[in-house]
């Protein structure tokens, strides 16, 4: 379980979302969409962030990024520390987000990345060592052996 999730633990779910507003009314405009993607957050609206499960905290962190209008979302390791059943829900939510904005996903779990991304970049020691589509990646036995054999 990660030590840190990008939420305010003492604030309620509502307050965590409200704090992300850039303009008055941002949350009111996005609230229904957020609850369609993350229905658990509606039920937990008055709960403190610190009382949410790890998966719910991840959902809240992503939901907070949705409050202002963004054309690009950077989502870093959304599956880290989550149970498989929670990961499935998170992946479904991220798929829905791609209709609203471009998503740059950083993910070490190959199964998750392979189901969400249409382009891939493999980074080693801070350098891009491969970029392309899944067929490009799978066409290289050397890349499969080096980077995916343990996936």
Task: Label each PLM-derived region with a short phrase.
Residues 87-100:
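Helical segment within the ABC ATPase nucleotide-binding domain
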Residues 48-52, 56:
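Conserved ABC ATPase signature
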Residues 73-77:
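Catalytic Walker B motif of ABC-type/P-loop ATPase nucleotide-binding domains
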Residues 10-29, 39, 132, 148-151:
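ABC-type ATPase nucleotide-binding domains, specifically the catalytic core motifs of the NBD
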Residues 113-115:
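A short, surface-exposed alpha-helical micro-motif characterized by mixed small hydrophobic
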Residues 11, 51-52, 65-66:
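ABC ATPase signature
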Residues 66-71, 100:
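A short, proline-enriched helix->beta-strand linker immediately N-terminal to the Walker B motif
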């Amino acid at each position: 379980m990660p030590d840190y999730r990008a939420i305010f633990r003492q604030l309620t779910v509502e307050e965590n979302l409200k704090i992300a507003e850039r303009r008055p009314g941002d949350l009111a405009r996005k609230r229904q969409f957020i609850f369609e993607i993350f229905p658990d957050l509606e039920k937990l609206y008055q709960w403190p962030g610190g009382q949410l499960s790890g998966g719910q905290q991840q959902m809240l962190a992503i939901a907070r990024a949705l409050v202002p209008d963004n054309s690009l979302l950077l989502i870093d390791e959304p599956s880290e520390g989550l149970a498989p059943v929670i990961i499935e829900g998170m992946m479904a939510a991220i798929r829905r987000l791609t209709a609203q904005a471009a998503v740059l996903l950083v993910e070490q779990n190959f199964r998750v990345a392979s189901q969400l991304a249409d382009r891939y970049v493999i980074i080693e020691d801070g350098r891009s060592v491969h970029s392309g589509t899944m067929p490009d990646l799978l066409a290289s036995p050397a890349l499969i052996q080096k980077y995916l054999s343990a996936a």
